[in-house]
Amino acid sequence: RLCYRTTPTTRLKRIVTELLERGCILDGVPGFYCQKDSGQWVLDIRGSGIMLPDRNLLGQIEAIQVRLDKVYNQKFYNLTSVDQYYGTQSKCCPHYVGVHEGDEVVCLTEGVMKSDLAYSFAQGSPYECGFVGLTGIPSYSQYERALEELDSIGVKRINVMVDSDYQVKEEVRKARDRYIEMGAAAGFEVAPITWAQKRKGVDDLYKHLFRNK
């Protein structure tokens, strides 16, 4: 339903060849770089997992996050080639799902996958609403961009639905408070939504509420 894909493991060279044969320009695309000795383009996969497209308001992919199969120091990494020859830095954007011009209300949370799952779980229910997912807590610069874009399409209210662990984690609480302040200062009605810590993220909450949908 979400159409996610796993990171390629065996066809990396063929993928690059097919893209070049189609006339795609890989210079400037995060994740691709050029080998100095051979001049060949390479796709830099640094860990296996699920690829999550980070989509802007127009539905265009600006970055790709990878949710790792095996978690070490972090669950996610951005597909990037910044430290390689002719490589490119990955820069995430506010991720939009189910947000359209004319919508008056959107929900704000953290994460591409969390936004996609929550929106998917709530579809067809009275709680169906578009989501904006910020890639990380805090992500103030992304939120500033989101506020400008949401204002441009007529959104009036933002439901702030960060993880319920803001009740015990100071960093998350401070970010939540700041999101509320920034949204109000930008002229939005801001509605902080709280639920029991048993369901950490809004995706967990919606999965519980709509599991029989």
PLM regions and their residue ranges:
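TOPRIM fold recognition
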Residues: 100-106, 113-213
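Conserved redox-cofactor binding core of oxidoreductases
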Residues: 4, 8-9
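Residue-level preference for alpha-helix termini and adjacent loops
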Residues: 3, 49, 204-205
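Short coil/loop linkers at secondary-structure junctions
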Residues: 1, 25-26, 156, 189
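Phosphate-handling DNA/RNA-contact segment within nucleic-acid enzymes
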Residues: 11-153
